């Protein structure tokens, strides 16, 4: 990845595939509409990264401390927190280095900066891939716990879970290394976009099926109590709201980034696509928001984990 000065984000591998065209600026041609670029202040970006960092460290600490949380589901949640932690840490580190370079506080050789650039890019890309994998793993774990409840412990045996976790981390590191090494190949971007779509479809199918089963179970209970409509409708609305939050957060936070990659494949030099490319930092900010929201959705809803977290915070004082 050729360095283009300190103004370039270190995560240039995926963004630098965009050819240098006049479409990246505000269009000067009166026949073309001006581009809308959402400016993300560096302070806000760093603040979101630090909040996510602290939040996910607390999740990992709570799960590690409480042996009651040493189960397959919480292991996946813990790994998701580690992935989100790495996403936040790498983005904060990248931004801090850029700010130091721009301020002239940090001076280093171009070759050293190039190596640091590659390492951070691999770290960011690998943590993104692992985050998506563990989001899918949590969905699969919940699906098995509902549809194969009697066989859950025989299916989700700890050795098997640990092998799956190790495999996810290994694949994430290897794939991110290949992605960064061959970032200028269309096949790399296509693989990333396909992977995101596959995870989105997997989560949507599993969670919708779980919601349908839960509503069916609620109808059966309602018929027994002869209160079919109030119970079923209330439960269905609550379940639909939960499903909307789960998939909505996933799509809104991750979708724009992968839309960016898709447009790099489809229309790298089109002026409209160029307007989208200008908001690359916004898309990374949304991924940081996902790293903040994930613990709220998957971890902090557990009463046991909240209790452990409270003990950890009290002990720290």
Swiss-Prot record:
Record's GO cellular component terms: cytoplasm; plasma membrane
Ranges facing Extracellular side: 1-37, 94-118, 184-191, 267-279
One Gene Ontology term of the molecular function aspect: ubiquitin protein ligase binding
Broad class of the protein's primary localization: membrane
One GO-annotated biological process of the protein: UV-damage excision repair
Compartment(s) where it occurs, according to its Swiss-Prot or TrEMBL record: Cell membrane
TM annotation in the entry: 38-63, 73-93, 119-140, 164-183, 192-211, 241-266, 280-300
Annotated keywords: Cell membrane, G-protein coupled receptor, Glycoprotein, Lipoprotein, Membrane, Palmitate, Receptor, Transducer, Transmembrane, Transmembrane helix
Cytoplasmic topological domain residue ranges: 64-72, 141-163, 212-240, 301-317
Membrane topology field: Multi-pass membrane protein
Glycosylated residues, chain numbering: 29
Annotated SUPFAM superfamilies: Family A G protein-coupled receptor-like (SSF81321)
Residues with lipid group (S-palmitoyl cysteine): 315
Function: Receptor for MSH (alpha, beta and gamma) and ACTH. The activity of this receptor is mediated by G proteins which activate adenylate cyclase. Mediates melanogenesis, the production of eumelanin (black/brown) and phaeomelanin (red/yellow), via regulation of cAMP signaling in melanocytes.
Self-association and partners: Interacts with MGRN1, but does not undergo MGRN1-mediated ubiquitination; this interaction competes with GNAS-binding and thus inhibits agonist-induced cAMP production. Interacts with OPN3; the interaction results in a decrease in MC1R-mediated cAMP signaling and ultimately a decrease in melanin production in melanocytes.
Record family assignment: Belongs to the G-protein coupled receptor 1 family.
Name by which UniProt lists this protein: Melanocyte-stimulating hormone receptor
Originating gene: MC1R
